[in-house]
Amino acid sequence: FLLRVSPDLEWHVACLKCAECGQPLDETCTCFLRDGKAYCKRDYGRLFGIKCAQCRAAFSSSDLVMRARDHVYHLECFRCAACGRQLLPGDQFCLRERDLLCRADHGPPPDGAAARGPRSPAPPPAHLAEPVPGRPPGPRPQSHKAAEKTTRVRTVLNEKQLHTLRTCYAANPRPDALMKEQLVEMTGLSPRVIRVWFQNKRCKDKKKSILMKQLQQQQHSDKTSLQGLTGTPLVAGSPVRHESAVQGSAVEVQTYQPPWKALSDFALQSDLEPPAAFQQLVSFSESGSLGTSSGSDVTSLSSQLPDTPNSMVPSPAET
């Protein structure tokens, strides 16, 4: 008998075995083909199936896995390569080749000065000092007068005055002298207070824009830098069940009987069971009753033979 594994491949029953373990393969088990070789399901999954990117072990159909781009990990292997902390769903991490790094390990170093280049601008201070309107800024105190504190007069603006100044600033951040005189009449403030307020407002907006620009550059550098190495920032998702254990489709094995086999069996069966007329003729010849039989009996017997060319008649010597 032959085993047909695919439409154009056939094996003898004794020749169809797993190329790795030698297990006989038949129509009762699953067979996989690769490069002209047959494999059982266990060896095919072990050799050519998807493996964990960390431990390089194969997956079973019941394993829960974590995916990062094209890489698949066991739940226990989905850890930071630097600190060994297991990454949970929702954690931010960075993928460098097959290694995973948590945000704390791939983020910028705590020392901002070391991370900046020689031409990088210095970050703005955390707290910005604001000049107080109503009194011109005096000279900076010397080191021996650092302990002394000067009392500054602060001008408190009401809601109406602030609304008027902000509306004018939105229309023109640098008003001319005529506009300032109109603001003095509308708000009741001194020209010096109005001038200082516009200066402070422009300074605040400029520092705010510089700070926002630096934050955007820092976020961009966090995404593309990994302590001097490039990586891909990702967010861990929920574990999923690994269903595709092997890549490839199983091939059905069928028992196949060649056409000449059926013809040979028919010929053997015909030889074992001769026709009834032939058996009767043989029995007559062995018993010797053919010579004593009448011509009518011989004629009737010969008529039962399908391939006898002439009728048998008794010879004159026998009569």
From Swiss-Prot:
GO cellular component, one term: nucleus
GO biological process: axonogenesis; neuron fate specification; positive regulation of transcription by RNA polymerase II; response to retinoic acid
Positions of region (Disordered): 106-151, 218-237, 286-319
SUPFAM superfamilies attached to this UniProt entry: Glucocorticoid receptor-like (DNA-binding domain) (SSF57716), Homeodomain-like (SSF46689)
InterPro entries tied to this protein: HD, Homeobox_CS, Homeodomain-like_sf, ISL1/2-like, Znf_LIM
Any Pfam family matching the protein: LIM
DNA bind region: 150-209
Protein function: Transcriptional factor that defines subclasses of motoneurons that segregate into columns in the spinal cord and select distinct axon pathways. Acts in conjunction with LIM-1, LIM-3 and ISL-1.
Name recorded for this polypeptide: Insulin gene enhancer protein ISL-2
Organism, as annotated: Gallus gallus
Organismal lineage: Eukaryota, Metazoa, Chordata, Craniata, Vertebrata
